[in-house]
């Protein structure tokens, strides 16, 4: 019986490369000369530090550009609100990995409401979709791709 898995994974090596590229761009930009600003990658999060709030916004834009150049979907970014420590502003960016329970239930409901002849099962942080026909599975993939659920999904282990 044909099946596939829906997962949400991020290549953290590419995130680290994007962080390095954004740091390099930060050091060469004229509007950041003489300003204490930096990107730090640690424990699957990126911490941005700057002297003003508008600089953090510019840095976030730079980081999003670097991520898209490295082919990492920016919808996986979870940007936390900034906090001020003295004259330094900090902002943390976390990344959504795995499909959380509420999102998984939304995907199951989406597929069931479309009346596609497939069965979906939640298996931890991924979903297994099984059906009799390959066309039904491809229709389920198209439904999930069209839905805007706030994070990127990959489709793996497509088996006939």
Curated annotation (Swiss-Prot):
Keyword hit for Nucleotide-binding: yes
GO molecular function: nucleotide binding
GO cellular component, one term: cytosol
Name of one Pfam family that matches: DUF520
Domain of life: Bacteria
Signal sequence residues: none
Keyword Nucleotide-binding: yes
Record's keyword terms, sorted: Nucleotide-binding
Cross-referenced PANTHER family: UPF0234 PROTEIN YAJQ
Function in brief: Nucleotide-binding protein.
Family recorded in the similarity comment: Belongs to the YajQ family.
Official protein name in the record: Nucleotide-binding protein MADE_1020535
Organism: Alteromonas mediterranea (strain DSM 17117 / CIP 110805 / LMG 28347 / Deep ecotype)
């Amino acid at each position: 019986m044909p099946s596939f898995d829906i997962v949400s994974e991020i290549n953290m090596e590419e995130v680290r490369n994007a962080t390095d590229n954004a740091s390099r761009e930060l050091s060469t930009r004229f509007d950041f000369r003489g300003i204490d600003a930096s990107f730090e990658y640690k424990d699957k999060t990126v911490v941005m530090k700057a002297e003003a709030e508008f600089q953090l916004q510019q840095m976030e834009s730079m980081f999003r550009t670097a991520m898209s150049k490295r082919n990492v979907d920016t919808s996986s970014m979870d940007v936390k609100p900034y906090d001020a420590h003295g004259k330094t502003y900090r902002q943390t960016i976390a990344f959504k990995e795995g499909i959380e329970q509420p999102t998984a239930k939304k995907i199951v409901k989406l597929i069931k409401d479309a009346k596609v002849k497939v069965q979906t099962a939640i298996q931890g942080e991924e979903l297994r979709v099984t059906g009799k026909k390959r066309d039904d599975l491809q229709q389920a993939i198209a439904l999930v791709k069209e839905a805007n659920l706030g994070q990127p999904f990959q489709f793996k282990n497509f088996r006939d």
